[in-house]
From Swiss-Prot:
This is F420-non-reducing hydrogenase iron-sulfur subunit G. Keywords: Cytoplasm, Oxidoreductase. Belongs to the [NiFe]/[NiFeSe] hydrogenase small subunit family. It is found in: Cytoplasm.
Length: 321
């Protein structure tokens, strides 16, 4: 009997949906074992009420991508939890908040002001800010109410498994689907990952060439020159987060001469990506002068170390208690 699958996108961009579609013929093969009963709002012509009408626990597997940003997102993930036996936080936004989680460094009022009033491309002479309720003649229009901060979905519901990536690489998605179909899943609460760091699968890794990693003697930003395509980006001074990031992507960014920014999420059992990253960087900076360079070139280091994981960070949860 085919496993029933539901896919829900909440506060995200749809890239994780496309990662599933990118399975191409592998997705066709998987459909011999899976019955997709719901996929919204991107792929199937269904309504949220269709999900709400399904019997509780009637769906074997629910994939949720995107973070929780408003009350509609919050309601829908609760409905998914009610209807699905297994929930997977699919992609880094669902797992840890993702890039939209950077909004947690600002108040909602500041975000709205910058988006709708101060933006150089916005024509809004009356300084109108969207409201949850607006009346147009005899009609009352509503928008989902913003929450005070971005949340990963496990702050709203219990999550069974996590998958990193922005989006997850389609090869890894295929392995996730296979694990689900065969029932070869890790313990509940685990990340579904190969357990390797980006550095472990990166051809630039000095260890692969029989060399040792050097201390970083200079900190560079990506626009400061063109990195040597053969040498480790960290050894060249670029702030690559490969040592602390799950490598299920196959080191795609270093392959095209771009530093790893950490979208794969932390390597288990690490709980806080940013803390692990600063610990790793601190161990390879050559001296205090290099540390000063780091602080000068990255004055808001939080935006680098927590680019994909701020809502799931320990410090974020402490601040919002």
């Amino acid at each position: 009997m085919a496993l029933k699958l539901a896919y829900l996108l909440v506060g995200g961009c749809g890239g994780c949906d496309m990662a599933v579609v990118d399975l191409s013929e592998k997705l066709v093969d998987a459909l011999e074992h899976l019955e997709i009963v719901f996929w919204a709002p991107t792929v199937a012509d269904v309504k949220y009420k269709d999900l709400e009408a399904m019997p509780d626990q009637s769906i074997d597997l629910g994939l949720i991508s995107g973070m929780v940003r408003n009350k509609e997102n919050e309601h829908l993930v609760k409905v998914m939890r009610q209807k699905c036996k297994i929930i997977v936080a699919f992609g880094i936004c669902a797992a840890l908040g993702g890039i939209p989680g950077m909004a947690n460094m600002h108040k909602n009022e500041e975000l709205f002001e910058n988006a709708y009033i101060k933006s150089p491309s916005t024509d809004n002479p009356n300084n109108v800010i969207p409201q949850p309720v607006s009346k147009e003649g005899e009609f009352e229009l509503t928008l989902p109410e913003f929450l005070d901060r971005v949340k990963p979905i496990d702050e709203v519901i219990e999550v069974d498994y996590y998958v990193g990536g922005c989006p997850p690489h389609h090869d890894h998605v295929a392995k996730v689907v296979e694990a689900v179909i065969t029932g070869n899943l890790p313990p509940k609460g685990s990340w579904i990952t190969n357990g390797k760091a980006v550095c472990d699968v990166c051809a630039r890794n000095p260890a692969v060439k029989g060399k040792t990693r050097e201390f970083v003697k200079e900190v560079k930003r990506m626009h400061e020159g063109i990195p040597d395509e053969e040498e480790c980006l960290l050894n060249q001074g670029y702030l690559c987060l490969g040592p602390v990031t799950q490598g299920d992507c196959g080191a795609l960014c270093p392959k095209v001469n771009i530093r790893c920014a950490g979208c794969g999420g932390p390597i288990p059992p690490t709980r806080d990506f940013g803390l692990r990253a600063i610990s790793a960087l601190g161990s390879i900076l050559a001296d205090e002068n290099v540390t000063d360079q780091l602080i000068k070139k990255y004055p808001v280091l939080t935006k680098i170390l927590y680019r994909y994981s701020l809502p799931g960070a320990m410090i974020n949860k402490k601040l919002f208690k």
